Amino acid sequence: MDGNTEDLQKFVPQVHFEQIPIKNLCSNQDYQRNLSIKHVQRAAANFDLYQINPVKVSRRDGINYVFNGQHTIEIVALVSGSRETPVWCMVYDDLVYTQEADIFANQMKYVKSLLPYEIFMANIEAGNDRELIIRDLVESYDLTITSSSRPGGICAVSTLINIYEKYGFHTLDRVLRLCVATWEGAPMSFSSNMLNAIARLDNAYGETMKDDTF
């Protein structure tokens, strides 16, 4: 290995990957958070094998301590019905307890969360029905779903999804129709507060609220 390659290795974690049965993993360290049974049950009910990440493990004194993936192993155990089930683990052999705790505490410090718009557009690319239906409905009014506020654009993506999920397609359709007819695509008319308010009005009053007198 030449000198340059050795220098580059400084930026590569010294780990190896193993499949380890869940029963051989320990996640009761004091720095660990409490296990959320509700989260485990919800994730298990919507289990997707391709969303399972490798579990990060510190091997100390022959014991496999989980410092990232506590809920993952419980989800897999619940879905598979066995703690004999193996999971892929990214194993560190050179950590001490305080390093594990520090990594656990700061693991999300520089992680950039996905924005609702980014999630929505990825679901479009994946061909997921809900997002395709919402996009087509929005575009039927000559509007677009956008990442920021602009004329004729809707950036309140989470609100569109929430209205669709809570009240249904026809309420979302009417909300958009009323906004377009009343404010003609003005950006503020598609704010989260405005969309939610009209959805609640429609839910409360239904057909007694006339479009032409809105």
Can you annotate each of these PLM segments?
Residues 82-214:
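Solvent-exposed functional surfaces
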Residues 1-90:
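Short alpha-helix boundary/capping and kink motifs at helix termini
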